[in-house]
């Protein structure tokens, strides 16, 4: 896709011109698009600050951040965490090896929380949606990737703004509403915990959309749209802002359908009947969520 060349004006974090506003207003949470930003100018996201942030992440009692090494392929699985490296060491060697680092929930640090709040304010203005009211649990994450590394095909359950701040890479995105791309069974398995259920195959080629991103540009990816990423021959740093819908009955409906299908029945596809989706979400969907939350809390308390 053609690169965007217009700079972001003034002190705006995201470009506010007519072109950018139209993209956000028309495509947010419906279709991927390329946008412009100025996050690459922020000291918070430069390597010296990231090294300090990685150390803070390591020092936390409950470590949410993650790193791995290896050379995964598009249709493969993610890499493995090396036993002989710490998070900070992996970041220090990011240009030499084949590492992929995720600094998770960095908005828990005060300076990053302030940045996230500024992002939410501007993104609400651009989309025309009050993201603080219609969406919840906004998450600020940083991805740092070694040269030429692939991030395998997968999907995320949140709407995602991915802003490139260092290096360049290509993001390949697929339409989650196309049953050839993502079957109902794959969606049901994903929402009941099998995050690897959606599988890439050769016929999918290089995405229905592909975006070449560089510092100052980024990609919006709607919730559940499968994607994979190919880094170029440089270290890549990307800032991700994720949002979850406050009300999303389709999730509960998919969870209900998963077990309904196990009984040999053919459940109604979510989206065809909002009232049916709502009933499913309020009954079994809520029960599943409660059971999952209880299990997660217990495992965290027991350290397993």
Please give the residue ranges for each predicted region.
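Transition-metal
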Residues: 2-121, 260-266, 288-292, 299-304
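Catalytic micro-motifs at enzyme active sites that drive phosphoryl/nucleotidyl and oxygen chemistry
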Residues: 21-23, 88-92, 128-132, 147-153
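Double-stranded beta-helix
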Residues: 164-220, 225-226
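A gly/proline- and charged-residue-enriched helix-loop-helix capping module
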Residues: 108-142
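Short glycine/proline-enriched turns and hinge-like loops at secondary-structure junctions
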Residues: 154-157, 164, 174, 231-234
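A short beta-loop-beta micro-motif enriched in histidine and acidic residues
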Residues: 137, 150-160, 206-207
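Non-heme Fe(II)/2-oxoglutarate
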Residues: 18, 53, 231-304
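Conserved short histidine dyad/triad with adjacent acidic residue
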Residues: 141-155, 174-178
